[in-house]
Amino acid sequence: MTIAVGRAPAERGWFDVLDDWLKRDRFVFVGWSGLLLFPCAYLALGGWLTGTSFVTSWYTHGIASSYLEGGNFLTVAVSTPADAFGHSLMLLWGPEAQGNFVRWCQLGGLWNFVALHGAFGLIGFMLRQFEIARLVGVRPYNAIAFSGPIAVFVSVFLMYPLGQSSWFFAPSFGVAAIFRFLLFLQGFHNWTLNPFHMMGVAGILGGALLCAIHGATVENTLFEDSEQSNTFRAFEPTQAEETYSMVTANRFWSQIFGIAFSNKRWLHFFMLFVPVTGLWMSSIGIVGLALNLRAYDFVSQELRAAEDPEFETFYTKNILLNEGIRAWMAPQDQPHEKFVFPEEVLPRGNAL
């Protein structure tokens, strides 16, 4: 008689079967994150293409914003809902549209649709990077880096209008529409003088500079290890040896600046840290704007410029330009308010 010792194999449930199917090796990995990413990305992109192709902004902004109305790639947009709707989610079955799809598009419901599905799509893409990193066995710094763009999207398209009176003050989804929003931020918030904007610019441009320097330095110090027609053919993805000389690169920059990175890990962490921190700082600044927080106000210069016509600085010039943006942009940007500015309140002074 034979006695078998051991555990009976556990019965596989539907969760295990689904887990196997989602993580199967295929051309486009799905994964659990794909259940969020793919539907949301598809709906956000589809909503944007539909809106820019066919949907007018006449009822919300008093403008034409689609290819059907004669716009082009730079001028079409999916526009924000009207100011009167506040922070309504603008659901298709909500009290505004009452299930009428055409009316829902006319009232700006597509903007909420694209913004919310876009936000969840970006989050799904970050989760995808976490999931694949875990399966491959690498650290999740790609996902951490992608938190920067997510922070910017959420702060600009969701947090800022939530701090203002309605979704109307968020940027519409279009090229020229984003430019309008930038002018709005400058005129109403003096955004370029905000220290968080300065940190964001330093991070993005600093990251671009580091990327250019790093790429050029690596190309400069490639080992001449082949007789191939060009240096790129000499590289094998599985080769054990280095493909460029860190020692030579270190010596080069030591001669240029008197200082250089000697640790590859610190160098690449720095290249990650600079742009991502810049994006996060910009996001924090936008949340501050949502709450109408002021940045730098050099009141002493403004007072002196008001008293002395011969005194002005670049700061006082910019303040006057901001007043001009507010006075001339508000009637165009918010026609529903029916703003009328008398001649005497329009900005005058040395700058204009």
Swiss-Prot record:
One MF annotation (Gene Ontology) recorded for this entry: oxygen evolving activity
One of the GO biological process terms: photosynthetic electron transport in photosystem II
Keyword Transferase: no
Protein name in the entry: Photosystem II D2 protein
Enzymatic class: oxidoreductase
Membrane spanning residue stretches: 40-60, 124-140, 152-165, 207-227, 278-294
Xref: PROSITE patterns: REACTION_CENTER
UniProt binding sites for chlorophyll a PD2: H197
EC number of this enzyme: 1.10.3.9
Protein function: Photosystem II (PSII) is a light-driven water:plastoquinone oxidoreductase that uses light energy to abstract electrons from H(2)O, generating O(2) and a proton gradient subsequently used for ATP formation. It consists of a core antenna complex that captures photons, and an electron transfer chain that converts photonic excitation into a charge separation. The D1/D2 (PsbA/PsbD) reaction center heterodimer binds P680, the primary electron donor of PSII as well as several subsequent electron acceptors. D2 is needed for assembly of a stable PSII complex.
